[in-house]
Amino acid sequence: MQDIYIGDEGKGIPLVLVHGFLGSSRMWEPQIDFFKDYFRVITPDLPGYGKSNQTKSHNNIQSITNLLLDCLEEKKIDKFYLLGHSMGGMIVQEMAKKSGDKISKLVCYSTGPRGEMPGRFETVDQSRENLKKKGLEITAKNIAKTWFIKGEDAKYFDICIEAGKQTSMETADNSLVAIKNWNGVDTLKNIKNETLIVWGDQD
């Protein structure tokens, strides 16, 4: 099993927060500060991201899913609340399909049931092409701007930029391949957990 960084703060029922494309556990700092008084907050850095940036990245959602489930099992976390953002939302959907009995409640935040979502600001292939043309830093900045109504002026924009800078070109491209090739529509019916879907009206 790969060794990845997993933040672990607070006490109580575990709350697992899974970041998305060009993210890291740092993005959850405001949530950690709030929720650690009520939950044991678990924040993994996915392979190739954040403090796991020396770990080989994956190019499919299923393998990341399996890794996270294995890591949680190793930490003896067998019942938890689960939230995923964007690509992380794809991962948590697969976690719920595979190990739904371990998940108390599920939150899908700014995500969908397939990687190539209609209405995305650009196709995944365009994202891959822009990554190659513009490089990681500009791509990370452009992606992070889409996460906030205020764009670069948002309070936590800089945290997101720093997270993106810790990623390699290979990891970023592998993640885009994983997103493009993932489609969970046909297996949505396998999610039996009580689920909250959070989708901003300007997303």
Predicted feature residues:
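Gly/Ala-rich beta-loop-alpha elbow adjacent to hydrolase catalytic centers
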Residues: 84-88, 92
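Short beta-strand/loop motif that positions the catalytic acidic residue
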Residues: 191, 197-199, 203
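Flexible "cap/lid" loop of the alpha/beta hydrolase fold
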Residues: 93-98, 103-134, 138
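Conserved alpha/beta-hydrolase catalytic His-Asp/Glu region
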Residues: 116-122, 133-189
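Serine-hydrolase catalytic-loop signature spanning alpha/beta hydrolases and amidase-signature enzymes
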Residues: 20-30, 41
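Active-site loop/oxyanion-hole signature of alpha/beta-hydrolase fold enzymes
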Residues: 30-33, 42-83
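Active-site glycine-rich loops that stabilize anionic/oxyanionic intermediates
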Residues: 12, 20-23, 86
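Alpha/beta-hydrolase fold catalytic core
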Residues: 1-15, 36-40, 69, 73-78
